[in-house]
Amino acid sequence: MVNTPVPGLGSCASRGLIAAPASIIRSRPGCDHAGECIVVCVGVFRKDWVMTSPKQRPPLVPGVAQTFPVLPLRDIVVFPHMIVPLFVGREKSIRALEEVMRGDTYILLATQENASDDDPATDAIYRVGTLATVLQLLKLPDGTVKVLVEGVTRAQVVQYTDRADLYEAEAISLPDEVGDVVEAEALARSVVNEFENYVKLNKKVSPEVVGVVGQIEDHAKLADTIASHLAVKIPEKQAVLETVKVADRLEKVLGLMESEISVLQVEKRIRTRVKRQMEKTQREYYLNEQMKAIQKELGDEDGRDDLQELEDRIKRTKLTKEAREKATHELKKLRQMSPMSAEATVVRNYLDWLLSIPWGIKSKVKKDLPFAQSVLDSDHYGLDKVKERIVEYLAVQSRANKLAGPILCLVGPPGVGKTSLGRSIAKATGREFVRVSLGGVRDEAEIRGHRRTYIGSMPGKIIQSMRKAKKSNPLFLLDEIDKMGADFRGDPSAALLEVLDPEQNPTFNDHYLEVDYDLSNVMFVTTANTLNIPPALLDRMEVIRIAGYTEDEKAEISRKHLIPNALQKHGLSAKEWSIDDAALLQVIRRYTREAGVRNLEREISTLARKAVKELVISKKKSVKVTAKNLETFLGVPRFRYGEIEREDQVGVVTGLAWTEVGGELLTIEGVMMPGKGRMTVTGNLKEVMKESISAAASYVRSRSVDFGIEPPLFERRDIHVHVPEGATPKDGPSAGVAMATTIVSVLTGIPVRRDVAMTGEITLRGRVLPIGGLKEKLLAALRGGIKKVLIPEENAKDLADIPDNVKNALEIIPVSRMDEVLHHALLRHPEPISWTEQPVSGAVVPDEDAAGVVAH
């Protein structure tokens, strides 16, 4: 606030008056004198101010209408006790001032509703104003007038007179209504406290005002004083002026201040944030300029800048037309950006990715068929079908100029060499090898990349792997393709449809690159443990099954690969440690039971570690592992080799099962007990296997007389069928013939041969239907010491894929009906009986449902 000294009157503060707040005092240079303006009130008034004569003015009588000249105001509300300098330019306003000077009366200061109206109508002027006295008046050469007025009291306009030369109105003075003094005092204290906070936030209000406001004891004057300093809209100030009750006026002022303080706090936060950002930008600019200066001093100014280097890379790279246009456009956009902007970093990273992947850079594919065959044979023993397919592909490549890369899917249990086979194929063909693990991938963006709109976005695994390979015709090994999942982010297996389709992958489009990239020269090899793959994806691949290894193959793999690797890893020589054939066979048979060779490798490594320990501690020259001392190194054998059971038993049948890790022997047990004809099945069996047991039971019951079983026996006995290892879920129909054999053995009391295993699905008519996974099941039978295996007759054609050593070691008998199964599996064939149905005296109500099967 500025206290303006008035000659002969002293300062505003000394007279208990208030000057116009600095927040609303402003100059209007070049004003066209079309209306009143507020001028800056600083320093001492000029000597050419005309002082009003100190005549006795007529007294103001509350409630009595008196006539006063009216001075319409723009953009300001004058409160009582407020001293304001005004700039007057309108004719009517000047005449009103002259009228006041002649009669030495009060002038009514009323704010007009529309500040842009030069000649407002009487109904466009607020009805409540302030009666004021003219303290000083200054006439300017151009006819305008500067005047200093002092507010005295509020007044309500009753009506305007008909004078045309000036505004004149009859008005009633409005005295303040004090009301509840205690309430007013409480509000006054709150208003003063809030005003202090307001002044701290609003730099346009002088801090000296707080001291002046704190000394005001009159609550009405306090409200008017603070209201005059608030930077609020004219209607809000007018509402304060029109409030006669002091308590209500203080409450309105308090509400306006709280609203303004909230806005000022937000403004302060914004200013602080903007200032901090500007300081950061200026600091980065300063540091960058310093770095450039340092580089110049070091002699690096001759080096080309990043943009020039990017332009040269675009020219050198063999981009497609689409990619070149995209790169040129992005480079042009980068040139127009500030180097420090975040968008520039995004564009620079994009160009770096686009230019880093190989465009038309191929490695020379080897077409030497004998070399490829020798590489595959040296790295892997067996796997003839896979090797044959690879050599066929190379043979076609040697004759044809262009051939879309084959997409092979190697399916087999863990540990059979699927992943290492992919590396060998790359070595045999002379391609770069890239492995992409898909296990656990659930996001489609992992394959196709993220769009550049995301922060930290990058290409998908395909483009990343191409950048790693640095060639456009590598070998891609997509590992564990059956372990992908799908969730709300998309299905990655659907994204792979484009990658693995030779018709689509020449125009593979990554979300990040946004340009087509040719994947037709890439050779894709995928691996999986099962064929649990979406049909559309499976249709795009050539499936090659890799079954488990035979004992002979495992022994050969151990001699060629596992034992030499163990010697190298443990720092041993062939003279220091060796294992004879009998011991190696014992390790395979009695310490491992798997389709692959991973556990076998672990056992061989254990033997090597034991040998190193013996050589170091006992100072021996060499350690030889034999069948006699094998248990000294590896402990008690973990598995039994030979007959699955030690003797032929009633109701115990050996079935064959397929699992993800290869084939397994499946023991099925059955017992009969007195009861009411119920059948119970246990062993964590799933729905398909339960239905298979029901079908087997119905078949046996329908043929009971042929098997020498009296039909009433089914209603007097309960049968319980159990499959051990209850913690392992079991499902599938291939154990149907084994279930039927178990039930027949239990009901007839005929033992089952312990050296016979069987597999096949049974129908209600006793037919044996084909099954899958025959090779894995036969290998499991061979590992378990089985002599005779019964298989469905329709699976006999699959024996062509079975190794000769397996077929020679097993007696494989194809069967088509259940009678043949019982002939080979039971010690003796059941003898049929003659049975005549006895008449039933009354209806029999069964205790259980029609199926009679209870599963626990």
Curated annotation (Swiss-Prot):
Q: Which Pfam families match?
A: AAA (PF00004), Lon_C (PF05362), Lon_lid (PF22667), LON_substr_bdg (PF02190)
Gene responsible for this protein: lon
- Indicate the segments forming the Lon N-terminal domain, all copies: 68-261
| Gene Ontology biological-process entries | cellular response to heat; protein quality control for misfolded or incompletely synthesized proteins
Q: What induces it?
A: By heat shock.
Query: Which reactions fall under this protein's catalytic activity?
Result: Hydrolysis of proteins in presence of ATP
User: Where would I find the Lon proteolytic domain in this sequence?
Assistant: 647-828
Q: What is its EC number?
A: 3.4.21.53
Q: Please tell me one Gene Ontology term that the record gives under cellular component.
A: cytoplasm
Is Cytoplasm one of the keywords? yes
From what organism does this protein derive?
A: Azorhizobium caulinodans (strain ATCC 43989 / DSM 5975 / JCM 20966 / LMG 6465 / NBRC 14845 / NCIMB 13405 / ORS 571)
Q: Which InterPro entries match?
A: AAA+_ATPase, ATPase_AAA_core, Lon_bac, Lon_bac/euk-typ, Lon_lid, Lon_proteolytic, Lon_Prtase, Lon_prtase_N
According to UniProt, the name of this protein is Lon protease
Summary of the function given for this chain in its UniProt record = ATP-dependent serine protease that mediates the selective degradation of mutant and abnormal proteins as well as certain short-lived regulatory proteins. Required for cellular homeostasis and for survival from DNA damage and developmental changes induced by stress. Degrades polypeptides processively to yield small peptide fragments that are 5 to 10 amino acids long. Binds to DNA in a double-stranded, site-specific manner.
Xref: SUPFAM superfamilies: P-loop containing nucleoside triphosphate hydrolases, PUA domain-like, Ribosomal protein S5 domain 2-like
- What Gene Ontology molecular function terms does this protein carry? ATP binding; ATP hydrolysis activity; ATP-dependent peptidase activity; sequence-specific DNA binding; serine-type endopeptidase activity
Which keywords describe this protein according to UniProt?
Answer: ATP-binding, Cytoplasm, Hydrolase, Nucleotide-binding, Protease, Serine protease, Stress response
Please tell me where ATP binds in this chain: G412, P413, P414, G415, V416, G417, K418, T419
Query: Where does this protein chiefly localize?
Result: cytoplasm
